[in-house]
Amino acid sequence: MRLLPAFPILTQLLFLLPIAAGLFGVLLPALGYLPDLGGNQFHFKIFNQLLEHPALPHAVLLTLFSGIIATIISLSLAVLLAAMLSRESLSGNKKNKMTSLFVIVRRGLIPLIAVPHAAMALGLAFLLAPSGWLVRWLSFLLMGWETPPEWVTLQDPFGLSLIFGLVLKETPYLLLMLLAALPQIRAQEYIRIGQSLGYGNFRSWLKLVLPQVYPLIRLPVFAVLAFSLSVVDVAL
């Protein structure tokens, strides 16, 4: 029993030690210490080259823009879809309609979430490239193009294709987190209260349900933001 208060600290250390090992494994070579390749002295040459690179400011701004905007859009779409599902659940008379509808949606979301990000990005590239499947279908059905159009649909300077890919991948995840959190706050009761006050379904969601459910999905939202700001394979 005396060791019981130390368990939270030991648990945190158990999770932090692998992170610290990975962090040192990245920082030491970045500081020039990599004995296997002859680097036995610490220096800041690599960081100086990074800071002097002319594309660094644009890269940082583009990373922040694409990551934050993708997270905001994904969360907004997830909230909108959850509100629509709640409205459909309230439109029926069966008490178990909400549960069955949410179960069906959850089962449909799981395969989407299981798709790797790199596989999704590769499929999206084949679809949206200037010579991709979408352009080929348009050319065959409507346009009659003989050569691919000179469109910058991938790796555009504003990161729009990256944002689109992240939104497609992260919206199902946030929607699944929302659907899992809604039963914990009795969302349907809040919606009925809002409707009794004259609010519509979506406005009741924004004013009553969202403030209650957001603390429950805050960590998943932060996880989406962290991934969107650090992802490499999707951007490539």
Regions found by a protein language model. Give the residues of each.
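Short helix-to-coil transition segments within interhelical loops
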Residues: 88, 186, 192-213
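Ca2+-coordinating acidic residues in Ca2+-binding motifs
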Residues: 46, 123, 192
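A short amphipathic helical element positioned immediately N-terminal to and/or at the very start
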Residues: 42-52
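Membrane-water interface segments at the C-terminal ends of transmembrane alpha-helices
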Residues: 3-35, 53-179, 183, 212, ...
